[in-house]
Amino acid sequence: MRTLWIVAVLLLGVEGSLVQFETLIMKIAGRSGLLWYSAYGCYCGWGGHGLPQDATDRCCFVHDCCYGKATDCNPKTVSYTYSEENGEIVCGGDNPCGTQICECDKAAAICFRDNIPSYSNKYWLFLPKNCRGDPEPC
């Protein structure tokens, strides 16, 4: 519970992508990113190391890689534009960085939705000391 409060307080001052990422997760996966994915496995949340623990954690690993490939921008703070067309999220706008980040967030939200069956409570609040091994490169 303490971790949830810390994350909530941190997000109060955050603008841009992290808040938008939460919104996309809710729209696409039907779950709160903050409640379900902010402290899950080895990669969901701040940082990450070791091997992803399951398919859900792998979504976060791939998302981290996607953010790492974003050029000339700060993925956690840049705002982006998207629309909904025929039930699909369409990233767009005049900001190439924002579009890149939107695509990363959209892909992660779809991955979360598609891997809901893999979600395991044993990886919620998973201790970093349990994250072992060398992950494959991005």
From Swiss-Prot:
Signal peptide: 1-16
Catalytic machinery residues: 63, 105
One GO MF term: calcium-dependent phospholipase A2 activity
Superkingdom to which the source organism belongs: Eukaryota
EC number(s) given by UniProt: 3.1.1.4
Chief place where the protein resides: secreted
InterPro entries: PLipase_A2 (IPR001211), PLipase_A2_Asp_AS (IPR033112), PLipase_A2_dom (IPR016090), PLipase_A2_dom_sf (IPR036444), PLipase_A2_His_AS (IPR033113)
Disulfide bonds listed in the record: 42-131, 44-60, 59-111, 65-138, 66-104, 73-97, 91-102
Name of the top EC class for this enzyme: hydrolase
Protein location: Secreted
Catalytic reaction annotation: a 1,2-diacyl-sn-glycero-3-phosphocholine + H2O = a 1-acyl-sn-glycero-3-phosphocholine + a fatty acid + H(+)
UniProt: Ca(2+) binding residues: 43, 45, 47, 64
UniProt tissue specificity: Expressed by the venom gland.
GO biological process annotation, one example: negative regulation of T cell proliferation
Entry's Gene Ontology cellular component terms: extracellular region
UniProt cofactor(s): Ca(2+)
Note from the entry: Negative results: has no edema-inducing activities.
Record's function text: Snake venom phospholipase A2 (PLA2) that significantly inhibits ADP-induced platelet aggregation in platelet-rich plasma of human, rabbit and guinea pig. PLA2 catalyzes the calcium-dependent hydrolysis of the 2-acyl groups in 3-sn-phosphoglycerides.
Record-stated family: Belongs to the phospholipase A2 family. Group II subfamily. D49 sub-subfamily.
Protein's name in the database: Acidic phospholipase A2 Cvv-E6a
Organism: Crotalus viridis viridis (Prairie rattlesnake)
